[in-house]
Structure formats: C-alpha cells, structure tokens
C-alpha cells in the first residue's frame, strides 16, 4: 500500500484575504467552501462546539490545500516563532514563472526575502 498526501490544512485569521492570496497570486482554484459544525467536526478537531469555515483549493497539479477559519475558538499562538518550533514551519511550492509570482506577491502587499 502506498499513501499520498490528500491535502494540507492551514488555519487562517481572515479566510477572504487568504483566499485572494491563494487564488489571485498562486493560481489555486476554490473547489469546496463550507461552514462546518457538529459532533463529527468536534471529534475531528479534538475541540467542543466547533464552528469553522473551510475552503479546499486545488493547484494546477491537482494537489490540495485546505484553509480553515475558526469562528468558535480564538487563535492560540502557541508557536514559538522560529524554524525549530514544533508544528508547521513552511510549505514549499513550485511555480512555472518565479518572477511573475514574485511580482504578484509584491502587488498583493507581500515582501520578498532572500
């Protein structure tokens, strides 16, 4: 049996802004967007009374990213803030035209770092 990654989930503070970045800057397509709640979501998240809006985005290569904005639970900034902190530290993307993507990142208000 071989496994493959279905999607990567990323919690965001502002889903609308995150969607604009992933679609307009990186070219992902929104496949599914929904408000979720209920016992099955509570069990999946390991929390009680969860209310979350999710959006699944598909890249041109068929890989998926899921963005999650929680409405029921405040952000808990437990991440230590450096590369050795436990948790997600980065996601690597491959693009066809790095210069064009960098220009879109800057136009979106992002900063490029070397």
Briefly describe each language-model feature range:
Residues 11-62, 100, 107:
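Core segments of cupin and vicinal oxygen chelate
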